[in-house]
């Protein structure tokens, strides 16, 4: 499957997130089980801008990390192009998170995620987000897939 085939309808099938927590608008590049590049159009309409910060809206760093994690989820689930019913993608660790540039409304946030390894049910990713080709955030992410509690 190519990046062009992963449109918003496919993203909604692969990720359980919905507004206001869906933070991936588009897949730009995709190599199954290797890497993914995604896009988030950051708008003033995001609910977190109401309080972060009034008069000086800045995208919270944890939301950038969440956008990277959702991109990692697409990379994992995207290999099969389906998410099993009830499967959820959980963070199990974040290492080396660094925030290097502020993200404002109107910015296009590009998320780049690469698989580092998969061992005993834990995925490890190298991830970074850019705005205008400048790194805004970088981190190593560790995630696992679990069935939701019934």
Curated annotation (Swiss-Prot):
CDD domains: FabZ (cd01288)
Enzyme class: lyase
Annotated EC: 4.2.1.59
One of the record's GO cellular component terms: cytoplasm
Top-level taxon: Bacteria
Reactions listed under catalytic activity: a (3R)-hydroxyacyl-[ACP] = a (2E)-enoyl-[ACP] + H2O
Active-site residue list: 52
GO biological-process terms attached to the record: fatty acid biosynthetic process; lipid A biosynthetic process
MF terms in GO: (3R)-hydroxyacyl-[acyl-carrier-protein] dehydratase activity
Pfam families per record: FabA (PF07977)
Position of the signal peptide: none
Localization per record: Cytoplasm
InterPro entries: FabA_FabZ, FabZ, HotDog_dom_sf
Keywords linked to the UniProt accession: Cytoplasm, Lipid A biosynthesis, Lipid biosynthesis, Lipid metabolism, Lyase
HAMAP family: FabZ (MF_00406)
Primary role: Involved in unsaturated fatty acids biosynthesis. Catalyzes the dehydration of short chain beta-hydroxyacyl-ACPs and long chain saturated and unsaturated beta-hydroxyacyl-ACPs.
Family membership: Belongs to the thioester dehydratase family. FabZ subfamily.
Protein name, entry field: 3-hydroxyacyl-[acyl-carrier-protein] dehydratase FabZ
Provenance organism: Cupriavidus pinatubonensis (strain JMP 134 / LMG 1197)
């Amino acid at each position: 499957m190519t990046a062009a085939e992963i449109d918003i309808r496919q993203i909604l099938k692969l990720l359980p997130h919905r507004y206001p927590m869906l933070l991936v608008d588009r897949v730009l590049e995709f190599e199954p089980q290797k890497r993914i590049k995604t896009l988030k159009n950051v708008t003033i309409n995001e609910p977190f801008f109401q309080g972060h910060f009034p008069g000086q809206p800045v995208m919270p760093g944890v939301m950038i990390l969440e956008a990277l994690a959702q991109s990692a989820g697409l990379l994992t689930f995207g290999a099969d192009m389906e998410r099993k019913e009830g499967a959820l993608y959980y963070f199990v660790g974040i290492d080396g998170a660094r925030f290097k540039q502020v993200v404002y409304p109107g910015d296009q946030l590009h998320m780049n995620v690469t698989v580092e390894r998969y061992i005993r049910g834990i995925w490890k990713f190298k991830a970074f987000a850019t705005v205008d080709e400048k790194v805004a955030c970088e981190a190593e992410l560790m995630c696992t897939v679990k069935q939701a509690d019934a």
